[in-house]
Amino acid sequence: HQLLHDKGKSIQDLRRRFFLHHLIAEIHTAEIRATSEVSPNSKPAPNTKNHPVRFGSDDEGRYLTQETNKLEPYKEQPLKTPGKKKKGKPGKRKEQEKKKRRTRSAWLNSEVAESGLDGDHLSDFSTTSPELYLRRH
C-alpha cells in the first residue's frame, strides 16, 4: 500500500513540476511582451512593483508541507513479512470517558450533598438575591 502511495506521489510531483515549468514559461513570455509594448510616457500599473522575479529551483518540490523529505522520489522496498498485529479493545476509549464522567458526577453530587444545598434551596436563593442587592444599594 505504501509503495503505491509513494509511486503516486512521485508521479504527481512530476506532473506538478511540468505544469509549473510550463506556467512559468508562459508568464515569462507574457511579461516580456507586456514590457515591450509599454510606451515610455505611460505610467506603470498601480499593482505592479519592481520586485526581482525569482522562480523556484530544482529543490522547489522537496520542502513542501505534508511531503516526506526523501532524496529519491520512489524506491522499491522489500515487502514486510506479515506479522501478528496488535489490536486494541474496540470500545476502550469510550469506556475511559464513561468512567471519567461517572467519577465527575459522583464528585459533584457528593459536594452538593455535603454542603446541604438541594435544588429547592438554590432556586430560593436565586429569587431573593436581586431583592437583597436592591436593598443594599
UniProtKB/Swiss-Prot annotation:
GO terms for molecular function: hormone activity; peptide hormone receptor binding. Pfam families: Parathyroid (PF01279). Residues 31-137 are annotated as: Disordered. Residues 36-50 have a biased composition (Polar residues). One of its GO terms (cellular component) is cytoplasm. There are several secretory forms, including osteostatin, arising from endoproteolytic cleavage of the initial translation product. Each of these secretory forms is believed to have one or more of its own receptors that mediates the normal paracrine, autocrine and endocrine actions. It comes from the Eukaryota. A motif (Nuclear localization signal) lies at residues 68-89. This is Parathyroid hormone-related protein. The gene is PTHLH. Keywords: Calcium, Cleavage on pair of basic residues, Cytoplasm, Hormone, Nucleus, Secreted. Its main location: secreted. The keyword Secreted applies. It comes from Equus caballus. PTHrP interacts with PTH1R (via N-terminal extracellular domain). Belongs to the parathyroid hormone family. The keyword Transmembrane helix does not apply. Residues 82-92 have a biased composition (Basic residues). It is found in: Secreted; Cytoplasm; Nucleus. Residues 17-28 are annotated as: Important for receptor binding.
